[in-house]
């Protein structure tokens, strides 16, 4: 009854705009739980009002619930603690629009020793931190925090989730809305074990700060994947960084701006400027020729850097504008042996050097400057100037007459596909081609379309008819000798194998013959010394004959078998 009267008095004082604080504490019987207080405040009031309620049993800390009406400047929070266990307090805080204080909501489950869990949120226009933390009961897991921030705020926003049990370090997920300037990171840690946290950081467009490093809170390793403002966009040409009519050309890790034919890109003006062109071919030494046709490859970018650096250094004191690479082709090697011996390879690069429209440079002065620079260059070997009329396919030998490329006359067999296209190209073949007669129309290096024979055929002896290539030859105009070389090499290899086989057979037979002769000699010696002692015959008088000679004469002394008594056995009787 006393508590009810105190609560009524507190509400009455708040209603009339009193600035004093009223509180009521009610403690239930049993246990040692601390009191629970509930505080509230009416609009316009500057004092704090609270109500504390403590449940019976256990040793749970107090639970507090605080709230604040619009226009107030004090903190509002709501804390609820369940009975039993030793869980830390749980707090829930919220803030109305226009408030400048912190708002949070904390919920803690009963039992275990889990750290507190906090949930904080902030309305648009506030400048304080907003976070949400959720911690499961039991175990010894560190706190888990989730923070978020509305557009326009300048404080940090993070979200942390930690599972119960084990000794895993905290896991944090941070995000930031467009327009903020604070750090954004996302960290995820699995429950249990002692693995350090893994952090993923990202930054929204428009942010100006870099993601900060994450220090592991335990374990032996950490994994961090940063992304955002420090790495730049993946597509270098999206959005297009080139202004005006220029187009963006993307290389491996850089880009450049390319204008229409006869124009160069002025980076200081950020626009295309009309210029004077000087085409030519240079021969360069490169370490690798693979993927030079691919503009996005590393090899092409290295070649582009070498070419542009060479010409920028050569024409640094002139009104030089830009160098454009037209075509890259591999120069034919002198021999296969020299190609294997040389560490570098030669490539031919067709370029166009563009100067200012009112330049005083001529084709002769440009060639002279390049040849002088080649003497001190390490990778550029040669330069050949190309007549401007030949470059565009126009009639004439004077380059000065072909500067107005849209007004020049195309060569016979060449034509412009569009009046605004500067190049004259072959539209039709120079003569009719018939596929049944093994003919085809191809574009030559000079741009002219010509009717030639198909691969494996050639025009022989001035005959216009395509005939099949002789044995061993193939390809265009029968210039491929692969079959002939293969036939010759195969014949030589077969002959060598046959010679080796014959030599092996002869060697084996000679060894067998030597062995048979030795056996025959041993047999002859054995028969020469043989004596037939059992019959009394001997071959000594047979004149080296293997058959014994029989003696027909009467011997002078007849051998007496009883003469030698020692050789005969005696009877025992």
Curated annotation (Swiss-Prot):
The record's subcellular locations are: Cell membrane; Secreted
Q: How does it sit in the membrane?
A: Single-pass type I membrane protein
Q: Which residues lie on this side of the membrane: Cytoplasmic?
A: 509-573
The principal localisation class reads membrane
Give the quaternary structure: Homodimer of beta subunits.
Q: Where is this region: Disordered?
A: 16-237, 548-573
Which parts of the sequence lie on the Extracellular side of the lipid bilayer? Answer: 18-480
Give the positions annotated as glycosylation sites.
266, 316, 397
Q: Describe how it is modified after translation.
A: Cleaved into two subunits, alpha and beta, probably between the first EGF domain and the SEA domain. Beta subunit contains the cytoplasmic tail and alpha subunit the extracellular tail. The homooligomerization into dimers is dependent on intrachain disulfide bonds.
User: Could you tell me which residue ranges the SEA domain spans?
Assistant: 274-391
Where's the EGF-like domain?
233-273, 385-425, 425-467
What is one GO cellular-component annotation here? extracellular region
Record's signal peptide: 1-17
Disulfide bridges in this chain: 237-248, 242-257, 259-272, 389-402, 394-408, 410-424, 429-441, 433-451, 453-466
Which spans does this entry mark as compositional bias, Polar residues?
A: 554-567
The record's listing under PROSITE patterns reads: EGF_2, EGF_3, SEA
Q: What task does this protein carry out?
A: Epithelial and hemopoietic transmembrane mucin that may play a role in cell signaling.
Organism name: Mus musculus (Mouse)
Which regions are flagged for Low complexity bias?
Answer: 16-234
Give the stretches traversing the membrane: 481-508
- Cross-referenced PANTHER family: HEART DEVELOPMENT PROTEIN WITH EGF-LIKE DOMAINS 1, MUCIN-13
GTP-binding is among the record's keywords: no
Keywords in alphabetical order, please. Answer: Cell membrane, Disulfide bond, EGF-like domain, Glycoprotein, Membrane, Repeat, Secreted, Signal, Transmembrane, Transmembrane helix
At the highest ranks, the source species' classification is: Eukaryota, Metazoa, Chordata, Craniata, Vertebrata
Q: What is this protein called?
A: Mucin-13
